Amino acid sequence: MAGEDEHLPQIKSPDSVTSRLTRREALLQLLRAGGIAASAAGTGIWLSKRSVRPAAASAQQARKDHRITADQQWPQLTVAQYAMDGRGPQPGEPRALVQKALENLGGMGRFVTHQDVVVIKPNIAWDRTPEQAANTNPEFVAEVVRQCWQAGARRVIVTDVSCNEAQRCFHRSGIEAAARAAGAEVTLPDPEKFREVDMGGVALKSWPVFTPFLEADKILNLPIAKHHELTGATLGMKNWYGILGGQRNRLHQQIHQSLADLAAFMLPTLTIMDCYRILLRNGPTGGNLEDVALKKTVVAGTDPVALDAYVAKAYWDLDAEHLPYLRLAANRGLGTVEFEKLAIKTSQLS
């Protein structure tokens, strides 16, 4: 039986995670992040050299707003979680969490309608297994695909622009097989299918974007909650780096402004965040199972700022002071950092 609770769940942060940095530590993190950027730049560089269609007189400019009309009948944020009773991962739990979260928000039919072309954006950035918690859980992805079909979608596409070699990432993450089994089209990044877009941002000006994200009717963001060496956490808005080609490591120089620019450009229909396993330390790549924590949770909603703020506080005790992109995004009217003021629907599964 699933217990229902309309109140905000108690938030606790892991004792082992430090949220405040000295200036020296911050500089060291920047240096380490530079190494990550260099290792990840292989994908970005090949895309930057070969990916962009011949330019028109000017770059395409389009804010991709896929939001649905707000309905006060439904919460803007929901949390579904299993009781942490000492049992390890159980078959079917990720699927049940997605189902409960969508039920709390009014069902997938509220977000996806007949004949929609839906693009699902998991995190498939790294050559890692599901147990390493560097990519979105494949069971989450498969269930979202099934829900889209049930809602009447015409096409369901699962894609991402990986940091490591894409074929290995899609395969080893388990996402390619799970998504295909659920009936989705799985699209790997193709250097011929990027389009230069004028994003009109402060840090992000003109940049190549993978075309499935420019042609969808609805876009569902499926990030995984992870530690990030540079920002402290990588959550929903950081997942939009995976729509870009080019030399993405350059964006780390103004990472918080870049994240706010991306959030203003790509406004998803719905965000469903995988917190089944989270990467508490040494993100975003991970690799050591000791850095992974089992939380058996999904957080979903229509306010991307509130969702990121909630998860950052819950697992890393980070707020908008530590994550400036949250305040930048809120100041642009993209959501609220004050998630405590929202009606949050929570469900405990057993």
Predicted regions and their residues:
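N-terminal and secondary-structure boundary signal
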Residues: 2-350
